Amino acid sequence: MNRVILYCRPGFEKECAAEITEKATQHDAYGFARVKENSGYVVFECYQHEDAERLVKTLPFHELIFARQMFVSGELLRDLPPEDRITPIVGMLSGAIERAGELRVEVPDTNESKELMKFCRKFTVPLRAALREHKILLGYEKADRPVLHVLFIAPGCCYVGYSYSNNNSPFYMGIPRLKFPSDAPSRSTLKLEEAFHVFIPADEWDERLGSGMYAVDLGACPGGWTYQLVKRSMMVYAVDNGPMAPSLMETGQVMHHQADGFRFEPPRNNVYWLVCDMVEKPAKVTSLMSDWLIKGWCREAIFNLKLPMKKRYEEVSHNLAVLQERLSENGINAEVHAKHLYHDREEITVHVRRFWSAVPGRRDER
Protein backbone atom coordinates (compact mmCIF):
# COMPACT_ATOMS: atom_id res chain seq x y z
CA MET A 1 0.00 0.00 0.00
CA ASN A 2 1.78 3.13 -1.23
CA ARG A 3 -1.02 5.68 -1.46
CA VAL A 4 -2.44 8.18 1.01
CA ILE A 5 -6.08 9.03 0.33
CA LEU A 6 -7.34 12.38 1.59
CA TYR A 7 -10.93 13.62 1.57
CA CYS A 8 -11.58 17.33 1.04
CA ARG A 9 -14.29 19.77 0.06
CA PRO A 10 -14.98 19.59 -3.70
CA GLY A 11 -13.13 22.45 -5.39
CA PHE A 12 -10.26 22.40 -2.89
CA GLU A 13 -8.33 19.44 -4.28
CA LYS A 14 -5.37 21.60 -5.37
CA GLU A 15 -5.01 23.08 -1.88
CA CYS A 16 -5.23 19.64 -0.29
CA ALA A 17 -2.64 18.29 -2.74
CA ALA A 18 -0.23 21.19 -2.15
CA GLU A 19 -0.53 20.72 1.58
CA ILE A 20 0.07 16.95 1.67
CA THR A 21 3.00 17.30 -0.73
CA GLU A 22 4.62 19.92 1.51
CA LYS A 23 3.92 18.04 4.75
CA ALA A 24 5.13 14.73 3.32
CA THR A 25 8.41 16.33 2.26
CA GLN A 26 8.86 17.65 5.79
CA HIS A 27 8.53 14.03 6.97
CA ASP A 28 11.06 12.79 4.38
CA ALA A 29 8.36 11.10 2.32
CA TYR A 30 8.30 11.83 -1.39
CA GLY A 31 5.75 11.24 -4.08
CA PHE A 32 3.17 13.02 -6.22
CA ALA A 33 -0.48 13.96 -5.90
CA ARG A 34 -3.16 12.83 -8.32
CA VAL A 35 -5.88 15.46 -8.50
CA LYS A 36 -9.24 15.43 -10.24
CA GLU A 37 -11.09 18.73 -10.03
CA ASN A 38 -14.27 18.75 -7.91
CA SER A 39 -13.82 15.06 -7.04
CA GLY A 40 -13.71 15.63 -3.27
CA TYR A 41 -10.54 13.60 -2.72
CA VAL A 42 -6.79 13.53 -3.45
CA VAL A 43 -4.48 10.54 -3.97
CA PHE A 44 -0.88 11.05 -2.84
CA GLU A 45 1.25 8.28 -4.32
CA CYS A 46 4.53 7.64 -2.48
CA TYR A 47 7.66 6.49 -4.30
CA GLN A 48 8.52 4.21 -1.38
CA HIS A 49 5.78 1.80 -0.29
CA GLU A 50 6.52 2.10 3.42
CA ASP A 51 6.22 5.91 3.35
CA ALA A 52 2.43 5.90 2.96
CA GLU A 53 1.97 3.80 6.09
CA ARG A 54 4.46 5.99 7.94
CA LEU A 55 2.69 9.19 6.93
CA VAL A 56 -0.76 8.15 8.14
CA LYS A 57 0.83 7.03 11.39
CA THR A 58 3.19 9.94 12.15
CA LEU A 59 1.98 13.00 10.19
CA PRO A 60 -0.37 14.62 12.74
CA PHE A 61 -3.80 14.71 11.14
CA HIS A 62 -4.75 17.81 13.12
CA GLU A 63 -1.98 19.71 11.31
CA LEU A 64 -3.71 19.24 7.96
CA ILE A 65 -6.00 22.15 7.12
CA PHE A 66 -7.77 21.02 3.96
CA ALA A 67 -8.03 17.26 4.59
CA ARG A 68 -11.20 15.89 6.18
CA GLN A 69 -9.83 12.36 6.44
CA MET A 70 -6.59 10.49 5.71
CA PHE A 71 -5.89 6.78 5.22
CA VAL A 72 -3.30 4.51 3.62
CA SER A 73 -4.46 2.53 0.58
CA GLY A 74 -3.37 0.25 -2.21
CA GLU A 75 -4.14 0.74 -5.88
CA LEU A 76 -7.67 1.48 -7.07
CA LEU A 77 -9.81 -1.64 -7.30
CA ARG A 78 -11.63 -1.38 -10.63
CA ASP A 79 -14.58 -3.21 -12.14
CA LEU A 80 -15.49 -5.21 -9.06
CA PRO A 81 -17.74 -8.08 -10.22
CA PRO A 82 -21.35 -7.35 -9.17
CA GLU A 83 -21.77 -10.97 -8.07
CA ASP A 84 -18.78 -10.78 -5.68
CA ARG A 85 -17.42 -7.38 -4.75
CA ILE A 86 -16.28 -8.61 -1.34
CA THR A 87 -13.46 -11.03 -2.25
CA PRO A 88 -11.16 -8.43 -3.91
CA ILE A 89 -11.60 -6.08 -0.93
CA VAL A 90 -10.81 -8.84 1.57
CA GLY A 91 -7.80 -9.78 -0.57
CA MET A 92 -6.49 -6.22 -0.54
CA LEU A 93 -6.65 -6.04 3.26
CA SER A 94 -5.41 -9.56 4.04
CA GLY A 95 -1.91 -9.39 5.44
CA ALA A 96 -2.01 -5.58 5.58
CA ILE A 97 -4.08 -5.16 8.73
CA GLU A 98 -5.79 -7.35 11.29
CA ARG A 99 -8.19 -6.91 14.20
CA ALA A 100 -9.38 -3.45 13.11
CA GLY A 101 -11.97 -1.82 15.34
CA GLU A 102 -14.35 -0.23 12.83
CA LEU A 103 -15.42 -0.33 9.17
CA ARG A 104 -16.46 2.73 7.17
CA VAL A 105 -17.74 2.32 3.61
CA GLU A 106 -17.69 5.87 2.26
CA VAL A 107 -18.00 8.07 -0.82
CA PRO A 108 -16.61 11.51 -1.73
CA ASP A 109 -18.77 14.46 -0.67
CA THR A 110 -20.17 15.20 -4.14
CA ASN A 111 -23.66 15.30 -5.64
CA GLU A 112 -22.66 12.52 -8.02
CA SER A 113 -21.89 10.22 -5.09
CA LYS A 114 -25.31 10.47 -3.44
CA GLU A 115 -26.67 7.46 -5.32
CA LEU A 116 -23.56 5.47 -4.35
CA MET A 117 -24.28 6.21 -0.70
CA LYS A 118 -27.40 4.04 -0.80
CA PHE A 119 -25.34 1.12 -2.09
CA CYS A 120 -22.66 1.70 0.57
CA ARG A 121 -25.18 1.42 3.38
CA LYS A 122 -26.44 -1.93 2.08
CA PHE A 123 -22.97 -3.23 1.23
CA THR A 124 -21.53 -2.48 4.67
CA VAL A 125 -23.41 -5.33 6.38
CA PRO A 126 -22.15 -8.29 4.28
CA LEU A 127 -18.67 -6.76 3.96
CA ARG A 128 -18.42 -6.35 7.73
CA ALA A 129 -19.39 -10.00 8.22
CA ALA A 130 -16.75 -11.19 5.72
CA LEU A 131 -14.00 -9.06 7.26
CA ARG A 132 -14.85 -10.43 10.70
CA GLU A 133 -14.77 -13.96 9.39
CA HIS A 134 -11.23 -13.37 8.06
CA LYS A 135 -10.12 -11.77 11.37
CA ILE A 136 -9.41 -8.48 9.60
CA LEU A 137 -12.12 -6.80 11.66
CA LEU A 138 -12.96 -7.48 15.29
CA GLY A 139 -16.38 -8.87 16.14
CA TYR A 140 -17.18 -5.64 17.99
CA GLU A 141 -16.28 -1.97 17.55
CA LYS A 142 -13.14 -0.91 19.42
CA ALA A 143 -12.19 2.76 19.47
CA ASP A 144 -8.44 2.29 19.98
CA ARG A 145 -7.94 -0.04 16.99
CA PRO A 146 -7.35 0.97 13.34
CA VAL A 147 -10.32 1.98 11.17
CA LEU A 148 -10.94 0.24 7.83
CA HIS A 149 -11.93 2.51 4.94
CA VAL A 150 -13.54 1.53 1.64
CA LEU A 151 -13.97 4.63 -0.55
CA PHE A 152 -16.21 4.09 -3.58
CA ILE A 153 -15.48 6.75 -6.19
CA ALA A 154 -17.74 5.12 -8.81
CA PRO A 155 -19.86 1.96 -9.05
CA GLY A 156 -17.49 -1.01 -8.78
CA CYS A 157 -14.41 1.19 -8.16
CA CYS A 158 -12.95 1.77 -4.71
CA TYR A 159 -9.85 2.53 -2.69
CA VAL A 160 -9.35 0.19 0.27
CA GLY A 161 -7.16 0.81 3.30
CA TYR A 162 -7.03 1.90 6.92
CA SER A 163 -6.32 4.78 9.27
CA TYR A 164 -5.21 4.95 12.88
CA SER A 165 -7.86 5.93 15.41
CA ASN A 166 -5.45 8.25 17.23
CA ASN A 167 -4.57 10.10 14.02
CA ASN A 168 -7.70 10.45 11.91
CA SER A 169 -11.10 12.10 11.89
CA PRO A 170 -13.51 10.25 14.16
CA PHE A 171 -16.40 11.17 11.87
CA TYR A 172 -17.85 9.15 8.98
CA MET A 173 -16.55 10.74 5.74
CA GLY A 174 -14.72 13.19 8.01
CA ILE A 175 -17.95 15.16 8.49
CA PRO A 176 -19.57 15.83 11.88
CA ARG A 177 -23.33 15.30 11.58
CA LEU A 178 -24.84 18.41 13.16
CA LYS A 179 -28.47 19.43 13.19
CA PHE A 180 -29.38 23.07 12.61
CA PRO A 181 -31.15 24.36 15.75
CA SER A 182 -34.54 25.80 14.75
CA ASP A 183 -34.15 28.73 17.17
CA ALA A 184 -30.69 29.79 15.93
CA PRO A 185 -30.54 33.20 14.18
CA SER A 186 -28.47 31.95 11.21
CA ARG A 187 -26.91 28.83 9.72
CA SER A 188 -23.46 30.19 10.54
CA THR A 189 -24.05 28.81 14.03
CA LEU A 190 -23.04 25.38 12.71
CA LYS A 191 -19.54 26.65 11.90
CA LEU A 192 -18.78 27.39 15.54
CA GLU A 193 -20.45 24.21 16.78
CA GLU A 194 -18.36 22.15 14.35
CA ALA A 195 -15.23 24.04 15.44
CA PHE A 196 -15.89 23.04 19.05
CA HIS A 197 -16.20 19.38 17.99
CA VAL A 198 -13.02 19.50 15.88
CA PHE A 199 -10.72 21.55 18.09
CA ILE A 200 -11.76 20.73 21.65
CA PRO A 201 -11.72 17.17 23.03
CA ALA A 202 -15.13 16.12 24.32
CA ASP A 203 -13.78 15.36 27.78
CA GLU A 204 -12.59 18.99 28.11
CA TRP A 205 -15.85 20.69 27.16
CA ASP A 206 -17.00 21.19 30.76
CA GLU A 207 -13.71 22.88 31.58
CA ARG A 208 -13.19 24.97 28.45
CA LEU A 209 -16.79 25.62 27.36
CA GLY A 210 -18.24 25.94 30.83
CA SER A 211 -21.22 27.76 32.26
CA GLY A 212 -20.56 31.28 33.52
CA MET A 213 -17.57 32.03 31.29
CA TYR A 214 -17.29 35.42 29.60
CA ALA A 215 -16.93 35.59 25.81
CA VAL A 216 -16.67 38.24 23.10
CA ASP A 217 -18.16 37.82 19.62
CA LEU A 218 -16.76 40.32 17.11
CA GLY A 219 -19.01 40.88 14.10
CA ALA A 220 -21.81 39.11 15.93
CA CYS A 221 -24.95 40.19 14.02
CA PRO A 222 -27.47 38.53 13.87
CA GLY A 223 -26.03 36.13 16.45
CA GLY A 224 -25.26 32.74 14.90
CA TRP A 225 -22.00 32.35 16.83
CA THR A 226 -23.32 34.11 19.93
CA TYR A 227 -26.10 31.50 20.00
CA GLN A 228 -23.57 28.70 20.57
CA LEU A 229 -22.00 30.58 23.48
CA VAL A 230 -25.37 31.41 25.05
CA LYS A 231 -26.45 27.78 24.68
CA ARG A 232 -23.48 26.86 26.85
CA SER A 233 -24.60 29.38 29.52
CA MET A 234 -21.83 31.91 28.84
CA MET A 235 -22.12 35.67 29.21
CA VAL A 236 -21.43 37.26 25.82
CA TYR A 237 -20.32 40.70 24.65
CA ALA A 238 -21.78 40.82 21.13
CA VAL A 239 -20.02 43.49 19.08
CA ASP A 240 -21.66 44.65 15.86
CA ASN A 241 -23.31 47.80 14.51
CA GLY A 242 -26.15 45.66 13.19
CA PRO A 243 -29.12 44.29 15.17
CA MET A 244 -28.97 41.11 17.24
CA ALA A 245 -31.73 38.50 17.26
CA PRO A 246 -34.33 39.46 19.93
CA SER A 247 -34.42 35.85 21.14
CA LEU A 248 -30.77 36.13 22.19
CA MET A 249 -31.20 39.50 23.88
CA GLU A 250 -34.13 38.13 25.89
CA THR A 251 -31.86 35.57 27.57
CA GLY A 252 -30.16 38.28 29.63
CA GLN A 253 -26.79 36.72 28.76
CA VAL A 254 -25.93 39.04 25.87
CA MET A 255 -24.53 42.58 26.15
CA HIS A 256 -24.85 44.18 22.71
CA HIS A 257 -22.15 46.75 21.88
CA GLN A 258 -22.92 48.66 18.68
CA ALA A 259 -19.30 49.29 17.79
CA ASP A 260 -16.56 48.53 15.27
CA GLY A 261 -15.08 45.10 16.03
CA PHE A 262 -11.61 46.40 15.19
CA ARG A 263 -11.82 49.15 17.82
CA PHE A 264 -13.67 47.37 20.63
CA GLU A 265 -11.84 46.66 23.89
CA PRO A 266 -13.24 44.22 26.47
CA PRO A 267 -14.73 45.94 29.55
CA ARG A 268 -13.41 43.24 31.88
CA ASN A 269 -10.18 41.26 32.21
CA ASN A 270 -11.59 37.75 32.64
CA VAL A 271 -12.82 37.10 29.11
CA TYR A 272 -12.05 33.49 28.23
CA TRP A 273 -13.35 33.15 24.66
CA LEU A 274 -12.97 35.40 21.63
CA VAL A 275 -14.86 34.39 18.48
CA CYS A 276 -14.92 36.27 15.20
CA ASP A 277 -16.54 35.69 11.80
CA MET A 278 -16.09 39.03 10.07
CA VAL A 279 -15.92 39.44 6.30
CA GLU A 280 -12.52 41.13 6.12
CA LYS A 281 -9.13 40.55 4.53
CA PRO A 282 -7.34 37.62 6.23
CA ALA A 283 -4.30 39.74 7.13
CA LYS A 284 -6.47 42.29 8.93
CA VAL A 285 -8.30 39.64 10.97
CA THR A 286 -5.04 37.83 11.77
CA SER A 287 -3.53 41.06 13.07
CA LEU A 288 -6.59 41.77 15.25
CA MET A 289 -6.61 38.26 16.73
CA SER A 290 -2.88 38.52 17.42
CA ASP A 291 -3.43 41.78 19.30
CA TRP A 292 -6.09 40.26 21.55
CA LEU A 293 -3.94 37.26 22.39
CA ILE A 294 -0.78 39.28 23.00
CA LYS A 295 -2.61 41.76 25.25
CA GLY A 296 -4.08 38.89 27.25
CA TRP A 297 -7.67 39.93 26.45
CA CYS A 298 -8.72 36.29 25.90
CA ARG A 299 -7.39 32.80 26.50
CA GLU A 300 -8.86 30.94 23.55
CA ALA A 301 -9.97 32.24 20.18
CA ILE A 302 -11.82 30.79 17.21
CA PHE A 303 -12.00 32.89 14.06
CA ASN A 304 -12.53 32.58 10.33
CA LEU A 305 -10.17 33.73 7.59
CA LYS A 306 -11.86 34.41 4.26
CA LEU A 307 -9.89 32.96 1.34
CA PRO A 308 -8.96 34.63 -1.95
CA MET A 309 -9.92 33.05 -5.27
CA LYS A 310 -6.32 32.12 -6.10
CA LYS A 311 -3.30 30.88 -4.11
CA ARG A 312 -5.53 29.94 -1.20
CA TYR A 313 -3.06 27.56 0.43
CA GLU A 314 -0.27 30.14 0.18
CA GLU A 315 -2.50 32.82 1.73
CA VAL A 316 -3.48 30.55 4.62
CA SER A 317 0.11 29.45 5.26
CA HIS A 318 1.34 33.04 5.23
CA ASN A 319 -1.27 34.30 7.72
CA LEU A 320 -0.75 31.39 10.10
CA ALA A 321 3.02 31.96 9.97
CA VAL A 322 2.53 35.66 10.76
CA LEU A 323 0.27 34.76 13.70
CA GLN A 324 2.77 32.26 15.10
CA GLU A 325 5.64 34.70 14.65
CA ARG A 326 3.88 37.54 16.45
CA LEU A 327 2.90 35.32 19.37
CA SER A 328 6.43 33.95 19.63
CA GLU A 329 8.02 37.41 19.48
CA ASN A 330 5.85 38.45 22.42
CA GLY A 331 6.61 35.40 24.52
CA ILE A 332 3.14 33.89 24.15
CA ASN A 333 3.07 30.10 24.37
CA ALA A 334 0.09 28.95 22.31
CA GLU A 335 -1.35 26.11 20.27
CA VAL A 336 -2.55 27.10 16.80
CA HIS A 337 -4.67 24.81 14.63
CA ALA A 338 -6.66 25.50 11.49
CA LYS A 339 -9.23 23.51 9.54
CA HIS A 340 -11.35 23.88 6.45
CA LEU A 341 -14.54 22.75 8.18
CA TYR A 342 -17.49 21.09 6.49
CA HIS A 343 -19.64 24.16 7.19
CA ASP A 344 -16.95 26.53 5.89
CA ARG A 345 -17.05 27.62 2.27
CA GLU A 346 -14.41 30.01 0.93
CA GLU A 347 -12.82 30.30 4.37
CA ILE A 348 -10.93 28.37 7.02
CA THR A 349 -11.43 28.30 10.78
CA VAL A 350 -8.51 28.91 13.15
CA HIS A 351 -8.30 27.97 16.83
CA VAL A 352 -5.69 29.43 19.19
CA ARG A 353 -5.25 28.40 22.81
CA ARG A 354 -2.93 30.60 24.85
CA PHE A 355 -1.09 28.94 27.75
CA TRP A 356 1.02 31.81 29.02
CA SER A 357 -0.17 35.22 30.06
CA ALA A 358 0.94 38.42 28.40
CA VAL A 359 2.05 39.47 31.89
CA PRO A 360 5.67 38.24 32.36
CA GLY A 361 6.10 35.50 34.92
CA ARG A 362 2.40 34.71 35.34
CA ARG A 363 0.94 31.47 34.06
CA ASP A 364 -2.66 31.47 32.92
CA GLU A 365 -5.12 29.47 34.93
CA ARG A 366 -6.64 26.63 32.98
Curated annotation (Swiss-Prot):
Pfam families in the record: FtsJ, RlmM_FDX, RLMM_N
Disulfide bond as UniProt keyword: no
Compartment(s): Cytoplasm
Binding site for S-adenosyl-L-methionine: S188, C221, P222, G223, G224, D240, D260, D277
Entry EC number(s): 2.1.1.186
Chief site of localization: cytoplasm
Catalytic site positions: K306
Keyword Ion transport: no
One GO biological process term: methylation
Enzyme class: transferase
The reaction(s) this protein catalyses: cytidine(2498) in 23S rRNA + S-adenosyl-L-methionine = 2'-O-methylcytidine(2498) in 23S rRNA + S-adenosyl-L-homocysteine + H(+)
Any one GO molecular-function label of the UniProt entry: S-adenosylmethionine-dependent methyltransferase activity
Cellular component GO terms, alphabetical: cytoplasm
Keywords: Cytoplasm, Methyltransferase, rRNA processing, S-adenosyl-L-methionine, Transferase
Subunit description: Monomer.
Family, similarity comment: Belongs to the class I-like SAM-binding methyltransferase superfamily. RNA methyltransferase RlmE family. RlmM subfamily.
Physiological role: Catalyzes the 2'-O-methylation at nucleotide C2498 in 23S rRNA.
HAMAP family cross-referenced by the UniProt entry: 23SrRNA_methyltr_M
Protein name per UniProt: Ribosomal RNA large subunit methyltransferase M
